[in-house]
């Protein structure tokens, strides 16, 4: 597993790029955001011990957000499922944290989806008239 230094203001990856690495913050902090219609939407501010970019290990899709260093950062770079597996085996506390965080992210995504479905469901319902 490699380590990289990213200076404050440096870009770790950009929305739309394709690569397969995820990152663990060893020091510093990182902002994750995306841009739609020239509006920047912050998704998260990450600090030491946090991770980001993990979807790239499991999906061959372009990045959906940009990651930018807020402070000077040292990042561990995990570039394969095998590296991740080894890292998780060697860091059981991080493994438990990762499972909790991924479960929280999935729960938040589900809540947003349910909210949007409820918001729009009335627009598409067809009610059969009663006799």
Language-model segments: residues:
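Short, mixed charged/polar active-site loops
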Residues: 40-42
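Solvent-exposed strand-loop boundary residues in beta-sheet-rich modules
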Residues: 36-38
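A small-molecule sensor/coupling module
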Residues: 83-123
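Helix-rich terminal scaffold detector
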Residues: 123-127, 131
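Short, electropositive, low-hydrophobicity segments enriched in small/polar residues
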Residues: 13, 20, 32, 53, ...
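Cyclic-nucleotide recognition modules
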Residues: 11, 44-98
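Regulatory nucleotide-sensing modules
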Residues: 1-33
